[in-house]
A protein has these predicted regions:
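Preference for long, amphipathic alpha-helical scaffolds in soluble/luminal domains
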Residues: 1-344
Length: 344
């Protein structure tokens, strides 16, 4: 139980939206609306996965495993919250729903979809419908197209991919071609990097700006377009491939903006995350909603190491403090057997 009134909590609140990852935010906000309006799921075709349940799903009551005192606490808090929900004044609920609606609309992202990820798009499509938007309204129509673009129909079967990842594929393909050719600049590599250069996110809104309002942009998203949520890992890879060309007249400004943005996004512990800074509020992974254990976007050794590698290539004198803090983080994160955990 997470009521839509969460949208009204101040930034200092332990449950403020900014304390979870971007993918969690974009999935949760429309879900707040759907749960607060008590929307019933529609399943006219009767699709189900009953064979996966040892207890019939309609009889199952305890979906959330509890393994720690904190999980016990949040499960109790969940029960208390449900019992008090009817006491929430309607004017507060309406205000919270309006704020959630505005949050969604700002991030709709056209036909690329909110967050450019399938789960968020589906929730948004349904939430907008419950808020009175017709299927042919541009907000819903664009969202539906974003969903349909991720569905692959094979006639007797269909599959859905969670997102598209052309920036990642293009920069990794470019790096592979550079390695194979023994040179950083070939026509194929140049074509890919020029395509990428036009997609660098330098201006405009982004959730990362909530904590870095004065930091100039310079990242790339994972997908075709996802300006609110550029990806630090992708940004390092693109800048690396651009640097390898040796053509700093063409790509130098993009590389500089990318590295400056990456440094500005360093977390307080010295590490680098995928999309955010200091998104390491581990207690939130104990709430019942976070049964998958991936609610957060904390710094990780693998992303930090790749950004460090880029900094080593660029050899900029001003990056020394960043490098020292990142190296200290990497050393602290080493496992007892000498390895490092790789999330991404």
């Amino acid at each position: 139980f997470i009521p839509v009134e969460v949208m009204l909590m101040p930034e200092a609140s332990p449950f403020h939206l900014s304390k979870v990852s971007y993918w969690s935010r974009t999935v949760m906000v429309p879900l707040f609306i759907l749960t607060s309006l008590r929307v019933m799921a529609k399943n006219p075709a009767g699709v189900n996965v009953r064979e996966l349940f040892t207890v019939p799903p309609e009889q199952q009551r305890d979906f959330v495993p509890v393994a720690s005192p904190l999980q016990h606490f949040f499960k109790g808090l969940d029960a208390v919250g449900r019992s008090f929900e009817p006491l929430i004044p309607q004017f507060i609920r309406k205000r919270a729903i309006k704020k959630a609606e505005a949050w969604i609309i700002e991030r709709l992202n056209g036909t690329d979809g909110i967050g450019a990820i399938f789960p968020a798009m589906v929730n948004v499509y349904e939430a907008l419908g419950e808020l009175g938007y017709s299927p042919d309204h541009p907000y819903r129509a664009d969202t539906r197209k974003a969903i349909d673009d991720l569905i692959f129909d094979h006639g007797d079967a269909a599959n859905v991919q969670p997102c598209a990842w052309p920036v990642w594929d293009t920069c990794l393909g470019g790096l592979a071609l550079q390695e194979a050719a023994g040179t950083g600049d070939t026509p194929a590599v140049r074509a890919g990097l020029d395509w990428l250069a036009a997609r660098q996110v330098c201006d405009g809104p982004g959730d990362w700006r909530d904590f870095h309002p004065d930091l100039p942009g310079g990242g790339w998203p994972f997908q075709y377009a996802n300006d609110h949520y550029p990806d630090l890992d992708d940004t390092a890879a693109v800048a690396w491939a651009m640097y390898n060309t040796g053509d700093h007249a063409t790509y130098g400004r993009a590389i500089t903006r990318a590295m400056d943005w990456l440094i500005g996004m360093q977390s307080k512990n010295g590490g680098i995350a995928a999309f955010d800074s200091d998104n390491n509020h581990e207690y939130l992974n104990a709430i019942p909603f976070a049964d998958h254990g991936a609610l957060l976007d904390p710094p990780t050794a693998d992303v930090t190491a790749r950004v460090l590698a880029l900094a080593g290539r660029l050899r900029r004198a001003q990056d020394g403090p960043f490098i020292r803090r990142a190296l200290a983080y990497i050393k602290r994160e080493q496992e007892a057997d000498g390895s490092w955990f790789g999330r991404w």
